Amino acid sequence: MESCWLTMESYQAALVVCIVSGLILAVAGYGNVRRLACEFLLKPPKRFRDDICEALLRGPENDQKPVLVDFGWRHGAVRRQMLLASAKASAYSNERHGSKIHISPDDIARGRSFADALDVHRRSGRILFGFFHPFCNAGGGGEKVLWKAVETTLKQSLNNIVVVYTGDCDTTGARILSNVEHRFGSQLDSERIVFIFLRHRKWVESRTWPRMTLLGQALGSIVLSIEAALCCPPDVWCDTMGYPFGYPFVSWLCRIPIITYTHYPVVSIDMLDKLRMMPEFRNSPTLWAKFLYWRIFMRCYTFAGSFVDLAVTNSTWTYNHINAIWSRTGNVSIIYPPCSTENLVIENAHDMWDRKHQAVVIAQFRPEKRHALILRSFSNFVKKTGSNMKLLMLGSTRGQEDRDYVKKLEQLAYSELAIPKESLEFITDCKYEKMKKYLQESSFGINAMWNEHFGIAVVEYAASGLITLAHASAGPLLDIIVPWDIEGDKQLERGSDKNRTGFFFKDRSDPDFCKITAEFPTLEELFVRADQLTDEERLAISQRAKRCVLHKFSDLKFSEDWAQVVDRTIQLLHTLRNDKVE
């Protein structure tokens, strides 16, 4: 017991010392501490060139053994300087040797010219764009945004170098780039891409934080951001995955522009409203505690956003939320994600609707995609009208939980709702080419998720010429299935049957459903209306939808818009550097 008290007293004393010291530093020495931290991160040791020259003169012991230099905690600043000076920046990844730096054989051959280029007082003109994306090898829509942004950044100038911070330590940079080329068709200059592998990615994984997940991942992202900055401090910080709580630390330590591409807010006003609208909210201490937790978290989220220089969002819905939460930023814009619509759009060879009488649902098998709502609506529609329409449900399954969810849907459809098996088919983990075939031969595409921030499946429906039946919220409503003038090739403010690109529905199960203000039909009613469309009406809607998504969501459009972000970022960087000099 005595030792326990001694431990507690020691802990309290240490805590007091830390708090007092922190206050003193905050009042008297914050600027100096920040300056010293920046110098530690961004400036190599004074004699680092001498050490590298010695290693160059010493050369490799044999052809198989690489020339390594070790600068301990200062390795990040030295690595940065070496890749800025190198003829092949990609050689300075930490993939194989961790904190030790492998001198490229090409730079060894350059000898003195390489050593001269290491001078910290020389401006190489190169700019390091650090893309923070810990799951860069995942192969999803977020990764497509990352790699198309990387491709555009590199094409914008030969002086642009990309540093990709990833936690995919189970693979190599070469394999990642091979996967990117195979999945997305991106043409990348691999010699100007440097992979920095982060060893602490587990701290941002949800399984690490079974409780207080938001808070845990926020703290984990701070650790991961600091690790990235220590391993190789960039000139520009580009977060393309959505880890905002590291921004203050990156800004304080590196004093560099921070650029974000936000797919959806970490916490939103909708989340708070959804909680407050629950019937049991007023009498539930648990829900009150959760509400308070989210409110505090949103305040922290707002604070983190104040360090952002340019915020890019993927949709109007996300823009509205980010613009409200990060109102201090002042530079929030929309760049729609690259959806490769130019590869999906096929022009009709004749004026006939020759597609199968079937509807397709493309959505991951998760409850929030509301497959059950679609099944019930489809069942009622078929029973009331006797229609022979077929429904296909396609989606990926991430694990056993998702596979169990599919079994529950099959039980609901075939047993409870008695939908004939010839009228409904579940297709899990469908290959992309097979999915494209279903899209090209079907007539209707359905999306039932409430407040889907964007909705890439809806873009694929429209690009493939399907008649879209989507929930009237967020991305599908505000950005994708919008009134379109096919002659002027532009979006219109008001919709009518003459400029329609699809249909919308609402449902009583919507968290924000209000019977009095409901202006949209139910999905069941929409099935009936869509089923009664003439071939001429279907062709007109299909053609307008294809033109709309080809104009707004092509890879080319994304590249043009991202190139402007790169230009603005370089201007910001030059302004910041000039301010430092003054």
Swiss-Prot record:
Intramembrane ranges, chain numbering: 241-261, 462-482
GO cellular component: endoplasmic reticulum membrane
Record-linked SUPFAM superfamilies: UDP-Glycosyltransferase/glycogen phosphorylase
Gene Ontology BP terms: dolichol-linked oligosaccharide biosynthetic process
Record Gene3D superfamilies: Glycogen Phosphorylase B
Subcellular location: Endoplasmic reticulum membrane
Name of the protein in question: GDP-Man:Man(3)GlcNAc(2)-PP-Dol alpha-1,2-mannosyltransferase
Organism the protein comes from: Eremothecium gossypii (strain ATCC 10895 / CBS 109.51 / FGSC 9923 / NRRL Y-1056)
